[in-house]
């Protein structure tokens, strides 16, 4: 599967998962600013959830969540801070999650949701 198509598949799968399985209200998908991008911004009813989606077809490169290294966490934190500032949401509790997606053998995708996957990164 092409990298762009694989990423799209993963994000759409994660989006359906957070809406249907988790019952989250999705505020934004692929939120971009000059600092970077966040795949999904959702509200679980109490907390704003900034979600990074990682999709893999094989385990050759390790677990998908391992791709969310320090540099990526720092970038996500900066984009989230800018989002909170732009919409005046500083008072809202927030967390950073990772959703791993992989194509399943039976046509059903494999999904692993890692809530509180990391803390906000500073410099």
Residue ranges and their predicted role:
Residues 3, 34-36, 107:
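Short acidic/glycine-enriched loop/turn segments that link adjacent beta-strands
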């Amino acid at each position: 599967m092409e990298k762009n198509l694989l990423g799209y598949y993963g994000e759409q799968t994660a989006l359906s998962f957070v809406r249907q399985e988790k019952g989250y209200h999705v505020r934004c998908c692929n939120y971009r600013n000059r600092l970077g991008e966040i795949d999904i911004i959702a509200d679980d009813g109490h907390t704003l959830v900034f979600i990074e989606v990682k999709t893999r077809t094989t385990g050759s490169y390790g677990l998908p969540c391992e791709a969310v290294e320090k540099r990526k966490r720092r970038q996500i934190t900066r984009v989230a801070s800018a989002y909170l500032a732009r919409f005046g949401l500083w008072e809202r509790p927030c967390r950073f999650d990772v959703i791993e997606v992989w194509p399943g053998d039976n046509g059903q995708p494999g999904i692993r949701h890692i809530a509180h996957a990391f803390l906000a990164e500073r410099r």
